[in-house]
């Protein structure tokens, strides 16, 4: 909605905004996806059908898994009709999906699925501030400059399909169960989780000792730990005794400054 406001498309319609010569619409994630094996006639899990190698791959409106199998996502189908109507009414297109591989793929698959041939240019921004949007609109690039990015995303998606669909069906044939699935990302991730679970299950805690010093200053109390640890109590006590009880430390410099600290990364599996 930030882009619509900046370009003056202030009138809100069902699935898009309009005004000032612009029509601004949006995608709800991947509205278009690669068709499932059933679409190509692979309705049964059979060894003689492997490997499944669609040529060409087909695009379909986003599907949802239900008790009845895969069905078309109604929300995705509705928004695709809105986008198709907007495409038909415009002279050219400004692509404002995320500035990255997946953002490029989202638009290109919609563009191809709808059979659109209108010329398009790329708005490449990483910030949605008014200034960034205006600057990006002044520096629009021809869509063809991002053909290689699209090719990379398209190839990745099709490779994932080939690996995931074929390997999952092969596993189903071998195991006799269709409840298992294999994927380029999900399978290694699951393996990492299982490995960590096994490590945690077999972990045996052991005691350790660590030296620390406590500093008291008025109402402030600070405790600092030495990074080294001892797995033997006698060694820790020997290290403690090696310190002079009368030793002291002097603060020679205090520096205060404001800094920006990035949020911590996600937990490491």
Tell me what each language-model feature is:
Residues 22-23, 31-72, 180-269:
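Long, highly charged, low-complexity internal segments
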Residues 6-10, 86, 113-117, 136-143, ...:
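Conserved, well-folded catalytic cores of nucleic-acid-processing
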Residues 36-39, 128, 133, 142, ...:
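Short capping/connector residues at structural and topological boundaries
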Residues 117-122, 157, 176-179, 254, ...:
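A generic, residue-level signal for flexible/boundary positions that often mark functional hotspots
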Residues 152-183:
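Amphipathic alpha-helical segments of the small helical/lid subdomains adjacent to P-loop NTPase cores
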Residues 1-154, 161:
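Intrinsically disordered, low-complexity regulatory segments
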Residues 77-81, 131, 153, 157, ...:
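Generic alpha-helical secondary structure signal
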